[in-house]
């Protein structure tokens, strides 16, 4: 929990005591993040091009909102009344973590996640099934036969994909950030190769 600064700001000529704000509750912080991310999403592009790979998109804003809401719904922050949670108070004794469990937080988090998935931009990266092989790209090692999945194409099964290569390609640099459909937001690299 942090203090939420009002939108109108402060007169910085005031004393520290006058500028001091108490911390807001965890739930108030999550509500603020959710509201701001929805507002940001309205002004962000749906997709990014190669020159703006490190810039946030609508999906990045909505995913940030969804993640904050998932944390708020989790047992750590939702109805936690252990010794640590009881110590999380302001100077006036106000509890910063709500000790009352609220099941509706899970519904709100699920709806926020569905907003991201509903954009239709992000999906699991898959490499095609390969019957030929080379040193760099071995033939697909087929998983053991399973009557429900072996004879169906992805996403219902694995007949047309290479599960190992689908995973490996994301980590060996073969799939660039621009070509990775799983990537919601990235730091990327600048022209000199240094991390941004």
Which ranges hold each PLM region?
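Structured, solvent-exposed acidic/aromatic patches
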Residues: 1-195
């Amino acid at each position: 929990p942090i203090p939420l600064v009002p939108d109108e700001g402060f007169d910085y000529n005031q004393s520290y005591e006058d500028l001091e704000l108490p911390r807001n509750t965890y739930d108030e912080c999550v509500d603020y993040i959710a509201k701001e991310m929805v507002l940001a999403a309205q002004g962000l592009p749906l997709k990014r091009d190669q020159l703006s790979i490190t810039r946030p998109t609508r999906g990045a804003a909505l995913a940030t909102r969804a993640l904050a809401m998932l944390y708020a719904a989790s047992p750590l922050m939702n109805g936690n009344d252990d010794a640590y949670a009881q110590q999380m108070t302001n100077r006036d004794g106000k509890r910063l973590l709500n000790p009352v469990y609220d099941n509706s937080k899970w519904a709100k988090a699920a709806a926020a996640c569905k907003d991201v998935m509903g954009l239709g931009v992000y999906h699991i990266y898959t490499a095609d099934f390969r019957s030929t092989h080379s040193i760099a790209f071995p033939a697909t090692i087929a998983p053991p036969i399973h009557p429900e999945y072996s004879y169906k194409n992805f996403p219902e099964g694995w007949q047309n994909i290479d599960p190992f290569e689908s995973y490996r390609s994301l980590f060996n640099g073969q799939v660039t950030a621009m070509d990775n459909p799983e990537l919601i937001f990235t730091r990327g690299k600048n022209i000199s190769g240094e991390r941004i």
